[in-house]
Amino acid sequence: MGRHNENIGHQARKRFGQNFLHDQGVIDRIVRSINPKSDQNLVEIGPGLGALTEELLKSGGSVTAVELDRDLTPILRTKFFNYPQFNVIEADALKFDFTQLATPERPMRLIGNLPYNISTPLIFHLLTFRGLVQDMYFMLQKEVVDRLAAKPGEDAYGRLGVMAQYYCKVESLFNVGPGAFQPAPKVWSAIVRLTPYTEPPLACKDVATLTTVVRQAFAMRRKTLRNTLKQLITVDALQSLDIDPQIRPERLGLPEFVRIADYVYDHPLENES
Ligand SMILES: C[S@@+](CC[C@H](N)C(=O)[O-])C[C@H]1O[C@@H](n2cnc3c(N)ncnc32)[C@H](O)[C@@H]1O
């Protein structure tokens, strides 16, 4: 414990969501899960002071790190100057165009102990590059991992889980307590693995329509489908799809959402805005 982040004099910045990992056991466990190989294209988001980066570099793979805090990039360059396969880019990962870091032939393995305040929009941003991604390993607030991996009927089930599971196989790997970080966050964290499908197993006709249906359905999660989806689909149409209009959205699985989205795409209601 405490091996990293010492003697560097960097004050953790709350606005950048800086909670630095300092538990070597947790770092090793994450890297063992990733199992990086020397010919791989590893991309780390938010390397911080390089606790994970160092172990990734030891695998021999190339590591490109995307870090927003301009005070950290020189520290990282100095720390890893012995590793020619290390590169740090000073950029906001939320706006960064990841197409410059990978090709379909050399996809990225995305890794990050992500800033918790931006993790949901960042995951949606990263999903847009899924064709260039082999897999993703993220440390997130446990509550967000629960939402990503949630199944129908669970409290955590909602838009994030449905859309992530549409594009990716989602696996919650293990939990990490606050004491593994400096400063310690207030909440528990967890590691999630997202593996994008080459082709979604339940492909819908139009993802924009699926997104609209899912967003609308969960906008009022305590209401029944006949209410939440009334601007998109009629009760008769829901019944024709073998979906009970009286149930709440949290009971619908991905196949039902895809069925509704395909119907809505083929039969747009006139009052749809
Ligand atoms: C939770 S810390 C993790 C640091 C390090 N990976 C570790 O495990 O100790 C999050 C890191 O993401 C960086 N960060 C915050 N917002 C960012 C953004 N929009 N784009 C890229 N990096 C960001 C922070 O400066 C910080 O280094």
Swiss-Prot record:
Pfam families named among the record's database cross-references: RrnaAD
Keywords, sorted A to Z: Cytoplasm, Methyltransferase, RNA-binding, rRNA processing, S-adenosyl-L-methionine, Transferase
Reaction catalyzed: adenosine(1518)/adenosine(1519) in 16S rRNA + 4 S-adenosyl-L-methionine = N(6)-dimethyladenosine(1518)/N(6)-dimethyladenosine(1519) in 16S rRNA + 4 S-adenosyl-L-homocysteine + 4 H(+)
GO annotations of cellular component type: cytosol
InterPro entries noted in UniProt: KsgA/Erm (IPR001737), rRNA_Ade_diMease-like_C (IPR023165), rRNA_Ade_Mease_Trfase_CS (IPR020596), rRNA_Ade_methylase_Trfase_N (IPR020598), rRNA_adenine_dimethylase (IPR011530), SAM-dependent_MTases_sf (IPR029063)
Example GO molecular function: RNA binding
Residues noted as binding S-adenosyl-L-methionine in the record, renumbered to the chain: 19, 21, 46, 67, 92, 113
Subcellular localization(s) per the UniProt record: Cytoplasm
Gene3D superfamilies per record: Ribosomal RNA adenine dimethylase-like, domain 2 (1.10.8.100), Vaccinia Virus protein VP39 (3.40.50.150)
Name this protein carries in UniProt: Ribosomal RNA small subunit methyltransferase A
Lineage: Bacteria, Pseudomonadati, Pseudomonadota, Gammaproteobacteria, Oceanospirillales
Function field: Specifically dimethylates two adjacent adenosines (A1518 and A1519) in the loop of a conserved hairpin near the 3'-end of 16S rRNA in the 30S particle. May play a critical role in biogenesis of 30S subunits.
EC nos: 2.1.1.182
